[in-house]
């Protein structure tokens, strides 16, 4: 009996290895062991965390500047290593960074890109007591970002006003990922305690939580429409993929073993085409799956294979895809010295706009102000048609940062409390120095 082949318009999606001249070469990508993607992108630029001594730096490079680089200007205002970066979704000339120095910085990108290094951010946000590991901007509310830190806290910020909006508690260990849902009303986190948690950040309430993976290595979670995707490791160190309904956050709707490689899986979800991309750190493969609403909820499509292992990955906004070539996704793959564009395409010959694979997509325009969002208002993301092709925004959106004055202790009690906090911070930093000294001795012996 012949096997019935499942029908899907994405069954033959393919990706090809880019040409050398299309890659960004001679880059000094960070050697940090932190489980970040190391790269982020908007329609004009991509940013990559830099390997720099004596502080934290990252580069922002225009997409058209492919080929060999000689001298790259940097954003270099952090006092310790940069751990994560994210572009503002509504302002192409703003980028945020977080660091081991406990600060969140918002930087302005000059029109046309950097020509000289910049050391002074437009805005510095302080409030975390340990290193800040992740940053992500709200997809609908203007100037709202979320960060997570080694102090086990998740904080939301108004980056223009320089204010901490809300603080989410409830984690008992290091937070390994923190992502918004599609309309910015909830966040999902994963933690070293092996749990995935869905929060309402405006009320500091846990919507649901579950032990998602039994392995000791890091896990990650993202929203995929009304589902939650988690990736992590089993007790026997196999890489796993789970799909959950966050309203019944107990048993996964689907649980798959991906392989037995050792690197963390990085998940990316394309809401327009319902495609999930999985890229493994330390290997050169990018698997992609189609998600559906009924069991088994996920179908493997294909795999991009490369001999060059990736250290990080990100995807560009759908607005800058080449629709005339049926390009449905474009990723940027990070290696130790290059960033390589990977284009995913549907093999079709027609030059007519293919509206079945290009529904209206995320417009990159705010639906809410920060004030509306924090008051409890929800809204759907604005969308735009790709039928007319990609049109760059005429100019940057105005950004007027308000610098908050940091008030010192007002009396003896507050002074003593601040003193005790600083003692704890000094003890933590001293322990980190001891660990790094031991690591240096181990590597030199």
From Swiss-Prot:
Q: Name one GO cellular component term.
A: cell tip
Instruction: Give one Pfam family.
Output: WD40
Which parts of the chain are coiled coil? 410-444
UniProt cross-references to InterPro entries, sorted A to Z = Coronin, DUF1899, WD40/YVTN_repeat-like_dom_sf, WD40_repeat_CS, WD40_repeat_dom_sf, WD40_rpt
- The residue spans of each WD repeat are 77-117, 127-167, 170-209, 259-299
Q: What is its main location?
A: other
Ordered alphabetically, the record's keywords are:
Actin-binding, Coiled coil, Repeat, WD repeat
Q: Which GO terms describe its biological process?
A: actin cytoskeleton organization; actin filament depolymerization; actin filament organization; aggregation involved in sorocarp development; cell motility; defense response to bacterium; endocytosis; gene expression
Keyword Coiled coil among UniProt keywords: yes
Q: Where in the cell is it found?
A: Cell surface
PROSITE patterns, A to Z: WD_REPEATS_1 (PS00678), WD_REPEATS_2 (PS50082), WD_REPEATS_REGION (PS50294)
Q: Please name the GO terms that the record assigns under molecular function.
A: actin filament binding
Name the domain of life. Eukaryota
Quaternary data: Binds to F-actin.
Q: What does the record give as the function of this protein? A: Required for normal motility. Participates in cytokinesis.
**Family classification:** Belongs to the WD repeat coronin family.
What this protein is called in its record is: Coronin-A
Q: Which organism is it from?
A: Dictyostelium discoideum
């Amino acid at each position: 009996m012949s096997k019935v082949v499942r029908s899907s318009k994405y069954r033959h999606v393919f990706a090809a290895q880019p040409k050398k001249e299309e890659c960004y070469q001679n880059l000094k990508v960070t050697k940090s062991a932190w489980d970040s993607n190391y790269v982020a992108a908007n329609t004009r630029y991509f940013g990559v965390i830099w390997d720099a001594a004596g502080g934290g730096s990252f580069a922002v490079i225009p997409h058209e500047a492919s080929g060999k680089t000689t001298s790259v200007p940097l954003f270099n205002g952090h006092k310790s290593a940069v751990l994560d970066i994210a572009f503002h979704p509504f302002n192409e000339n703003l980028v945020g960074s977080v660091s081991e120095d406990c600060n969140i910085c918002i930087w302005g990108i000059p029109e046309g890109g950097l020509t000289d290094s910049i050391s002074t951010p437009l805005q510095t946000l302080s409030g975390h007591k340990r290193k800040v590991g992740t940053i992500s901007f709200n997809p609908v509310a203007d100037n709202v970002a979320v960060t997570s830190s080694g102090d086990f806290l998740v904080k939301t910020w108004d980056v223009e006003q320089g204010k901490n909006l809300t603080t989410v508690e409830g984690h008992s260990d290091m937070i390994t990922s923190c992502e918004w849902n599609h309309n910015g009303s909830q966040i999902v986190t994963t933690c070293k305690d092996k749990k995935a948690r869905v929060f309402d950040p405006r009320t500091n309430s846990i919507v649901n939580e579950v032990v998602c993976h039994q392995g000791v290595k890091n896990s990650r979670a993202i929203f995929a429409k009304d589902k939650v995707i988690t990736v992590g490791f089993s007790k026997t160190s196999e890489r796993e993929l789970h799909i959950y309904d966050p309203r019944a956050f107990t048993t996964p709707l689907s649980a798959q073993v991906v392989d037995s490689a050792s690197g963390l899986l990085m998940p990316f979800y394309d809401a327009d085409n319902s495609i999930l991309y999985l890229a493994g750190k330390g290997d050169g493969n990018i698997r992609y799956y189609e998600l559906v609403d009924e069991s088994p909820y996920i179908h493997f499509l294909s795999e991009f294979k490369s001999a060059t292992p990736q250290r990080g990955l990100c995807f560009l906004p759908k607005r800058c895809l080449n629709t005339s070539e049926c390009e449905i996704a474009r990723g940027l793959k990070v290696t130790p010295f290059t960033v390589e564009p990977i284009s995913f395409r549907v093999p079709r010959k027609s030059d007519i706009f293919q509206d079945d694979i290009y529904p209206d997509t995320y417009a990159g325009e705010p639906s809410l102000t920060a004030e509306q969002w924090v008051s409890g208002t929800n809204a759907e993301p604005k969308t735009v048609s790709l039928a007319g092709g990609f049109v760059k925004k005429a100019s940057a959106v105005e950004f007027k940062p308000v610098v908050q004055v940091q008030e010192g202790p007002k009396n003896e009690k507050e002074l003593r409390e601040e003193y005790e906090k600083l003692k704890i911070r000094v003890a933590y930093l001293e322990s980190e120095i001891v660990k790094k000294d031991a690591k240096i001795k181990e590597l030199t012996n």
